């Protein structure tokens, strides 16, 4: 099991994966104030700032809609939020409006934001720089299965051994860049 998979099983444990440096700082501050164990996963790659809106407010257990859409919901975490936004732009050029939800807190998961978006779009894609087993995708599937059965596609590391390399090369190899996410979502929709 990966470290994140083990963390998901521990009661009252918070699991976070920030999308950018703004969210990373906010997550660390929240972790210091939280009464209980917290695991924060930081990616290696530099990413653009996503959460620079004046109204941005970080809260453990709350996701953020970073792009409105009507045809498909893309739920992403960590560095994959930027990839999801890039894919959404490409999809828009094809007439597919993707709603993008940034999930920093994987546990506890903001089920309401995901379910409300799934009601609107009818399809959900998860994107994570992690195994598709036991991470964000599994948590989203659990929530939807219990409350709103919805078709879901999980984009992430399949059940294979990882490889070494630069962050950019690995993100591209495993289809986690904007082009890879675009192709997967387009095929799914």
Residues of each region from the PLM?
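Thiamine diphosphate
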Residues: 43-189
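Structural signature of the thiamine diphosphate
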Residues: 11-53, 179-189
């Amino acid at each position: 099991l990966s470290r994140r998979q083990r963390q998901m099983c521990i009661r009252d444990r918070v699991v976070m994966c920030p999308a950018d440096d703004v969210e990373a700082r906010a997550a660390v501050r929240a972790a210091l104030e939280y009464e209980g164990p917290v695991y924060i996963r930081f990616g290696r790659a530099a990413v653009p700032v996503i959460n620079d809106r004046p109204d941005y407010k970080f809260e453990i257990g709350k996701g953020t809609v970073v792009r409105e859409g009507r045809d498909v919901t893309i739920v992403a975490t960590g560095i994959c939020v930027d990839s999801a936004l890039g894919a959404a732009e490409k999809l828009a050029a094809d007439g597919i409006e993707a709603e993008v939800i940034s999930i920093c807190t994987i546990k506890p998961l903001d089920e309401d934001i995901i379910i409300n978006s799934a009601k609107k779009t009818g399809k959900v894609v998860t994107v994570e720089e992690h195994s598709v087993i036991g991470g964000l995708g599994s948590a989203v599937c659990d929530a939807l299965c219990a409350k709103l059965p919805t078709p879901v596609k999980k984009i992430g590391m399949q059940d294979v051994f990882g490889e070494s390399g630069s962050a950019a090369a690995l993100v591209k190899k495993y289809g986690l860049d904007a082009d890879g996410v675009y192709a997967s979502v387009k095929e799914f929709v």
